């Protein structure tokens, strides 16, 4: 059970964003986010969007830095991934 964080590479609102996910349960993800002070409004169906300025802080709090590819692979393997086409 691990909370994963990809590199900030997703541009929006004048900054770059990372995705914070769990490879086990959404509860693990929500618990980690709450302890780290990530607002619940940052949750987007299967991940939290976090701005680049929080990256180092979240890694220090225990999030495992991974590539985007590894994040998606592990999220899908966990059964927690919600594909873009299924978000409607």
Regions found by a protein language model. Give the residues of each.
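The feature represents the first ordered module of a protein
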Residues: 1-29
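Terminal leader/tail segments of proteins
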Residues: 1-3, 17-18, 35, 40, ...
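Extended, non-core accessory segments
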Residues: 2-3, 12, 24, 42, ...
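Acidic (Asp/Glu-rich) sequence patches and key acidic residues
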Residues: 7-17, 34-35, 60-61, 65
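A short, structured beta-strand/loop element
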Residues: 18-46, 60
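Short, compact, well-ordered microdomains
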Residues: 45-87
């Amino acid at each position: 059970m691990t909370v994963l964080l990809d590199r900030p590479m997703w541009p929006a609102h004048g900054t770059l964003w990372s995705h914070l996910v769990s490879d086990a349960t959404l509860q693990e993800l929500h618990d980690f986010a709450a302890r780290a002070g990530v607002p619940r409004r940052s949750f987007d169906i299967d991940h939290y969007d976090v701005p680049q300025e929080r990256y180092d802080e979240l890694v220090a709090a225990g999030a495992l830095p991974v590539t985007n590819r590894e994040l998606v692979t592990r999220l899908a393997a966990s059964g927690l991934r919600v594909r873009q086409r299924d978000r409607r």
